[in-house]
Every structure is written in structure tokens, then in C-alpha cells.
């Protein structure tokens, strides 16, 4: 007869075997879902190692290519790569995973991106949704004047000088500065906004500080340069300081709207920090993601001179045209610019931008959500009874490479948007995911698209571009995905005639 000690040991081993092997591998509601790695049912260590090594995006993409639209990444984590999955998870308003709150909260104070629960997010989104709507932005006199100032007095004069002197320029930091100046002017008004396009050495210092900011703890961020800088911008507004000498003073559209809304409908957050936390998120996204989009759009166009010519023909149909005076015709007057709606209606420009955002999504990484707790669980692509609290996500990188929707998906082919197969354009648009989808879709998507189209129309009306140095142009595939080499050196040549 076995001793009590031996019997206890056998029982313990049996329980451990059941808990750590039999249950997760064979009895878990997730057991039928293909495993991305043989250890996925047991531990998250494998996927965490891939994340920490910066290989999460490609790892998940390859897992979907091998196993299909739903894969298990860890004991309580799934990745989904299908249109039906998007509808269930994101249109179905699954709440965000705690990961967002850990990573994106500024000043120890919630903002929309960092809010896990849908209700407070919806409340704050209602405060700002009108001023970020496409109709409001296209009709905005303030945004029109911001565009005229940034283009006429900052960007185009720099490109004219670079072209005249036959210099090359790193367009990544320059166009990140364009994004920052556009965004900060819409938030704070032109008299209180940044002017980093004209201060590129100072801007590079800011970018260096921001690289450190991205890996800091919450506590270190609060004492650091970036949060202090943003808070100083907000406090200048409260003191009614207006340091910039500009030809047109625009309204602080976003700042005023958010401040007034929080005054009328306060919550338990300190109002100054609630405003600063939200606006810092806008400033971060507004310079980084648009700067990436500008860079890869110019990189692709620079490899296709014939397409540049075709795009220019399309741009010259605008009225007024974006023609900027040559160096011998210097003028201090602001450009008259085409309406945003007329620029938005240009099919080739739209196709080039869409294809750039598809292939070179600035945010290629998974956007995690948590499955809701329901009586019978949830169903995804034929897998049923998925319990609540499971980390679940999709990523634009994988979605944008579904071959059935985007044939030869690794190739940059703008004409796929102009000449889609019968009925295919609907799926192409539904799977187009650089801004997410559903109630948590990026609030600034319309602003970003309008800005990028406006700026690129101005650039390619006046210049051709040519690559001088694109070493390290491949994306690092981080959450916000920059070129590995942090540069793209281009030559700008004025268009004759």
C-alpha cells in the first residue's frame, strides 16, 4: 500500500498535469483554436519575448498565414484577422485592454486613448467629435488659414531654398515638424502654436527628448521634458499669452472646445491635467503618424517618376492651383489654396495616399481589446464559447495583407484603388484599417487625411522628388512605426512651367 506521502505526491502531480496541460490544451474553450506556438496554451512567455524583441507584428502576421484567421497567442490571448472579426470586436465595442491605460496615460490622468471603459471614452469623444468631423474640417476657416500659413511661410520656402541650392534634406523630421505645426495650431491657435518647421535644430532636440519619453515610466514622464512642455503650452493659453507674430490669428479650436466642455460637465479629474493629457496625445499622434505617412508617400512616389507626372497633371486641375513663386518672385502674401473638398475629390491622390497607408501603416501593431463577460461567451469565425476577459486583437499590418482582398499585397500599387475587381472595392475599404474602426476609431483621422492631401498636393504641384539616401527606410514595426534609419534623404527639383 502506498504511503500517504507518495499518494499525496501522485495527487499533486495529477492536479498539476490537469491544470497546466490537460485543461489548457484539451478542455479550455480556446483549445480548438490553432496555436501560434506549441507553448501558447501554457504560457505567454513566447509572445512576450517576441514583443520585447520588436518582432510581434511579423510573428502574428506569419501565424495567420500558417493557421488562418484566428490564432491563439497565449493562454488568454487571441489574434483575429478577418472582416467578420473586426465587426465583432471593434464595431461590437469590446472594451479596451488594460494595456492602453498602462501605456498611454499622461500626467497620471486619463485621456481618450488610455481610457479602458467605453462610457467615459464616449463622454469625452462627444465633446470633440463635431470639430473633428469631415464636414467641419473642410469648412473650417481656421484650418484653411493654418494651411496657408504653414505652406506659404514655412514649408514651401524651405523646399524652394533646398531646391535652389541643390541640397538634399531629410524629409522625416521636416515633415514631422509640419505635422506638429498643423496640429498645435488647430489645438492652440496660430499665435500660441509651435513653429518648429522654422526651428529645425530645436525640433531635433524635441524629437530626441520624445524618443526617451516613449520608454519612460509614468512617474518619470511627469517630471520630464515632454509633459512639462505640453503643460506650458496649456498654461500660456490660460494666461492669454500669444507669443507668435503671424499674419492671421486663428482660434484655439480644440483647446477652447475641450475646456468649455469640461467646465460645463466636469468629472473627477483635475481640469488642467485632463486638458493637458488629452492634448498631449493629439500632439504626439499629430506629428508622428502624419510624419511617417508623408515620408513613405514621398519615398514611393520618388521611385515612380511617371506617377509623379500623372499626379501633377491631376493637381493642375485644381483651382486655384498650388503654384508657389520661384526664388526670383519672392512674395510675403499667403497662397490662395484650393478647397479641401476639391483636393479630397482627386482620385489619383486619394489612391496614392490609401495605398501608402495600407502598405506602410504608421500603426501596424495589434490594438488589444478584452472579450466581454457573457453567459455563453462570444463567437469568432466559427469558434464558440470564448470566455470573458480574453485579450483579443487585430492589426492593420495583417489585415492589409489579406491576399483575397489585396492581391500581391506586399506591392505598392495605387491603381488597385482606381481599378478594383467587381465588388472588391467594398471589402478593400472595409479592411482599410490605419485608423482602426468602430467607436474607438482614431478621432483625428479626418484631420490627418485632409492635412496630408493638402501638403502633398502643394509639394508635388511645385517639385519632383528623387531619392538620394534611403538606407534604413524599412519600418521598425513598433506600435507607431518609424523608419529604422530615422531618415529619408530627398532631392527636390522645381517643376518647369
Predicted regions: what they are:
Residues 97-106, 120, 139-294, 310, ...:
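Cytochrome P450 heme-thiolate monooxygenase catalytic core
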Residues 481-497:
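C-terminal helix/juxtamembrane-tail motif
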Residues 205-208, 303-363, 387-390, 413, ...:
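Cytochrome P450 I-helix active-site segment
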Residues 377, 394-423:
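Conserved cytochrome P450 K-helix/beta-meander segment immediately N-terminal to the heme-binding cysteine loop
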Residues 50-60, 224, 228, 232, ...:
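Conserved cytochrome P450 K-helix E-x-x-R motif and the immediately C-terminal K′/meander segment
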Residues 193, 305-308, 428, 441, ...:
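Cytochrome P450 heme-binding "Cys pocket" and the immediately downstream C-terminal segment
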Residues 289-302, 455:
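Short, small-residue alpha-helix embedded
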Residues 2-123, 148-153, 157, 273, ...:
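N-terminal membrane-proximal hinge/A-helix region immediately C-terminal to the signal-anchor transmembrane segment
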